[in-house]
UniProtKB/Swiss-Prot annotation:
This is Small ribosomal subunit protein eS1. The gene is rps3ae. The lineage of its organism: Archaea, Methanobacteriati, Methanobacteriota, Thermococci, Thermococcales. Coiled coil: none annotated. One of its GO terms (biological process) is translation. Pfam families: Ribosomal_S3Ae (PF01015).
Length: 198
């Protein structure tokens, strides 16, 4: 009986083909992995986790995790869309040290082209700071992230988030309140995509 099950398993693997997964165009459309399936329909909606280093080749970006979801399969090629990003926990832990203050902000935004996102930002102050200073820094986060959402389309907002540009703007403004060790966009989740009118 066990031998029969083993044969059946081998037969199922023989039927499977490997599909090449590609990053979204605005991440360069590069190959980011392979996935097996016995039917192309089963590849649809699969989510792959890669790092920004895998996409760009930049070893300093290995702590940035990206999530791409397959939305189309043509032949052996599987094409993806961006579903989210987050920073590795180990990286976040390395930023938060004794006698520092971590300020978190969670913001639901809508980009210029109608994508609804949940954006989580964080800032690390060099020392313990007052509650009023925390509030002021969180307000700066909110103002910059909302302003960027109004100005940028989905693709540009995501790129400016993962490459650190938005975080750099937050750090620049927040240091007027108190010097920061670091500011980061630590997580993005796509909540809703705009409906395409046929």
């Amino acid at each position: 009986m066990a031998a029969k099950r083993a044969t059946t398993t081998r037969d199922k693997w023989k039927l499977k083909q490997w599909y090449i997964i590609y990053a979204p165009d605005f991440f360069g459309g590069v190959e980011v992995g392979l996935t097996p399936a016995d039917d192309p329909e089963k590849v649809l909606n699969r989510v792959v986790e890669v790092t920004l280093k895998d996409v760009t080749g930049d070893f300093t970006k290995s702590h940035v995790k990206l999530y791409f979801q397959v939305y189309d399969v043509k032949g052996q090629n599987a094409y993806t869309k961006f579903k989210g990003m987050k920073l590795a926990r180990s990286y976040i832990r390395s930023l938060v040290r004794r006698k520092t203050t971590r300020i978190d902000g969670i913001f639901n935004i809508t980009t210029k082209d109608g994508y609804k996102l949940r954006v989580m930002a964080m800032a690390i102050a060099m020392r313990r700071i007052q509650t009023s200073q925390e509030r002021a820094i969180r307000k700066i986060m909110q103002e910059i992230i909302y302003k960027k959402a109004e100005e940028l389309n989905f693709k540009d907002f995501v790129l400016e988030s993962v490459n650190g540009k938005i975080a750099a703007e937050i750090a620049k403004e927040a240091k007027k309140i108190y010097p920061l060790r670091k500011a980061e966009i630590r997580k993005i989740k796509v909540l809703e995509e705009p409906q395409v009118i046929a």
